């Protein structure tokens, strides 16, 4: 796809795009043998005058690299949130205490999509990810995020440490999560402008990222496992911040 367009597949993600950003949708692809299904007919009704192509299952599989597309795909312009930069976001006014999510090198697109979906549910102002050595925004991420990737700014940065310093200069407190921290996240006041930093699967936070955090915390673990899936850990930490703010 061209640099300013992307594909989105799966019922939830496609429905969200058609409902919330229909002007960005350029084309709709429907799998031939699914035209009569009610869910597909509902999608087609939402699409209105959007051009529709009916294609084979084989063509759909090729288009989505054999992902679980459920017989429906759209091609759309990237939304404005994809073009927001960190500087403009930090200078914008906040109606509530800002909460950011920073992901340090999450490489699995399914985990990235799940983290973005959780961040959207928690009311996070933006998700910040590195451009290199990490999963980027793609159709798999959009599908797993179920529309959240089109609703919440996801900012890809070239230098994560520099971005953390920019957050600090804007008065944002940086908390990193690591297994060996001496303080539990439940012991910390999260009712302040905050950026929560989560590490990659298995590796955790890089040392340079740890060095740029104001504080390191852990999630208390009672069982034999040493760590949680990053999307699960993200949900625990974000909603602890939300709990404290209510």
Give residue spans per PLM region.
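Short, glycine/polar-rich helix-capping loops at beta-to-alpha or helix-loop-helix junctions
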Residues: 39-40, 134-140, 203-212
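Active-site/ligand-binding-proximal alpha/beta "capping" segment
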Residues: 175-225, 229-231
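Structured adenosyl-cofactor binding patch, chiefly the S-adenosyl-L-methionine
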Residues: 121, 142-148, 207-246
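N-terminal positively charged helical leader segments and presequences
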Residues: 1-91
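Short hydrophobic alpha-helical runs that function as membrane-insertion/retention elements
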Residues: 53, 126-130, 218
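Short basic, glycine-rich beta-strand/loop surfaces that mediate nucleic-acid
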Residues: 63-77, 145, 149, 153-157, ...
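RNA substrate-binding interface of SAM-dependent RNA methyltransferases
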Residues: 23, 91-183
């Amino acid at each position: 796809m061209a640099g300013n367009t992307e594909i989105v597949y799966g019922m939830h993600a496609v429905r969200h795009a058609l409902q919330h950003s229909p002007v960005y949708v350029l084309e709709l692809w429907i799998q031939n043998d699914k035209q009569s299904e009610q869910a597909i007919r509902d999608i087609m009704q939402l699409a209105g005058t959007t051009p529709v192509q009916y294609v084979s299952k084989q063509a759909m599989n090729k288009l989505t690299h054999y992902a679980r597309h459920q017989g429906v795909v759209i091609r759309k312009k990237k939304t404005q949130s994809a073009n927001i930069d960190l500087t403009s976001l930090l200078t914008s006014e906040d109606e509530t205490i800002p909460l950011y999510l920073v992901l340090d090198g999450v490489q699995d697109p399914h985990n990235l999509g799940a983290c973005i979906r959780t961040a959207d549910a928690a009311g996070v102002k933006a998700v910040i990810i590195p451009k290199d050595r990490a999963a980027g925004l793609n159709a798999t991420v959009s599908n797993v995020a179920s529309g959240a990737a089109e609703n919440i700014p996801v900012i890809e940065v070239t230098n994560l440490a520099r971005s953390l310093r920019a957050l600090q200069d804007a008065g944002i407190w940086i908390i990193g999560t690591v297994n060996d921290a001496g303080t539990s996240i439940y012991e910390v006041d999260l009712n302040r402008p905050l950026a929560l930093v989560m590490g990659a699967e298995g590796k955790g936070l890089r040392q340079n990222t740890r060095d740029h955090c104001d504080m390191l915390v852990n999630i208390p673990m009672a069982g034999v496992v040493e760590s949680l899936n990053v999307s699960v850990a993200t949900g625990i930490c974000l909603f602890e911040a939300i709990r404290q703010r209510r």
